[in-house]
């Protein structure tokens, strides 16, 4: 198991569970097994104990950081003698493919929305800023999909600048995992959210040929972590589940449909090659090195259970 860097305080799950608010006084009744089933990403795992032990204390920590953010803005406005346009509190969530980032992002959005009521908690992913498959193929980098050069980083940075600048309306391109491509002329629209969650493998990376990090726009950053062999297991397990789903649906437009036309063992072998030649190098060379830029790291073990929380000290 990897060790936390010296500038992180490490909390075991049971220690984290007891922070801030006594466990007996917490109310997570709005998060039900049915809600979890709707929130969790395909083939991911999450339990009610995860909500109580990990995510509820995490929400309290986010609320603390959000309150501090608002105080800082108020004091700055007082110092400057003028009010600055409202700007959302932005949370970035990073980590490997198949590690469970989407589930973490959706659950935090749900729990924060319940906490903040009428305030708007929005969520987007960086997937929509991938170059379309046609463009990746034209540039000869389709096999590098997910690597830094496969994203339209100028567009993503402009989007985040508009979000943080408090623009009235911002739009992000939509991505479909069914066809594994950006959807043409389809967008998600956000109207000045109070809290904005941005999830993606590249959220802590620097843009190529740019001095700006995407994380420069974040007020709090999280990294979902696990041992590489575990992530590989989850990746293959998810592929097999998606393969079975594609076989049952028999939809030729589904990205996984062609794999249903060959023997399962051959399809799984192909998925392992993709892991070894694409996802593993991307994790090793570009994603994992950004882990220590995160303010907080959720470390997972078998069954997607979170066993440690690493909190940056400085």
Question: Positions of the model-derived regions?
Answer:
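Conserved NTP phosphate-binding and transfer environment spanning the P-loop NTPase/kinase superfamily
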Residues: 2-26, 33, 39-48, 203-314
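Glycine-rich phosphate-binding loop used to anchor ATP phosphates in small-molecule kinases
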Residues: 69-72, 81, 85, 155-216, ...
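Hydrophobic "anchor" residues on beta-strands that sit immediately upstream
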Residues: 123, 195, 221
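Pre-Walker A (Motif I) flank of P-loop NTPase domains
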Residues: 85-91
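Glycine-rich phosphate-binding P-loop
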Residues: 91-110
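Conserved nucleotide-sensing/catalytic segment adjacent to the nucleotide-binding pocket
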Residues: 39-54, 122-125, 129-181
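Post-Walker A helix-loop "phosphate-sensing" segment adjacent to the P-loop in P-loop NTPases
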Residues: 110-122
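N-terminal pre-Walker A segment at the start of P-loop NTPase domains
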Residues: 47-81
């Amino acid at each position: 198991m990897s060790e936390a860097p010296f500038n992180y305080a490490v909390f075991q799950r049971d220690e984290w569970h007891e922070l801030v608010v006594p466990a007996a006084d917490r109310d997570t009744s709005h998060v039900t097994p049915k809600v979890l089933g709707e929130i969790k990403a395909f083939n991911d795992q999450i339990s009610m104990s995860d909500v109580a032990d990990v995510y509820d204390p995490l929400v309290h920590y986010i609320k603390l950081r959000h309150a501090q953010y608002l105080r800082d803005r108020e004091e700055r406005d007082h110092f400057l003698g003028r009010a600055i346009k409202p700007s959302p509190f932005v949370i970035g969530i990073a980590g490997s493919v198949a590690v469970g980032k989407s589930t973490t992002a959706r659950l935090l959005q749900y729990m924060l929305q319940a906490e903040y009521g009428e305030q708007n908690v929005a969520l987007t992913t960086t997937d929509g800023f991938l170059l379309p498959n046609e463009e990746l193929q034209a540039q000869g980098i389709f096999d590098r999909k997910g690597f830094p050069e496969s994203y339209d980083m100028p567009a993503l940075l402009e989007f985040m600048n508009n979000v943080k600048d408090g623009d009235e309306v911002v739009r992000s391109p939509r991505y479909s995992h069914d066809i594994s491509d950006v959807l043409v002329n389809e967008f998600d629209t956000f109207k000045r959210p109070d809290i904005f969650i941005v999830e993606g493998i590249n959220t802590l990376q620097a843009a190529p040929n740019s001095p700006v990090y995407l994380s420069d726009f974040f007020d709090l950053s999280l990294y979902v972590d696990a041992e590489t062999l575990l992530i590989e297991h989850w990746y293959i397990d998810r592929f097999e589940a998606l393969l079975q789903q594609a076989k049952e649906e028999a939809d030729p437009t589904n990205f996984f449909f062609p794999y249903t036309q060959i023997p399962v063992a051959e399809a799984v072998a192909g998925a392992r090659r993709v892991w070894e030649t694409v996802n593993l190098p991307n994790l090793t060379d570009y994603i994992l090195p950004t882990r220590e830029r995160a303010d907080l790291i959720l470390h997972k073990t078998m069954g997607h259970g979170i066993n440690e929380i690493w909190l940056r000290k400085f």
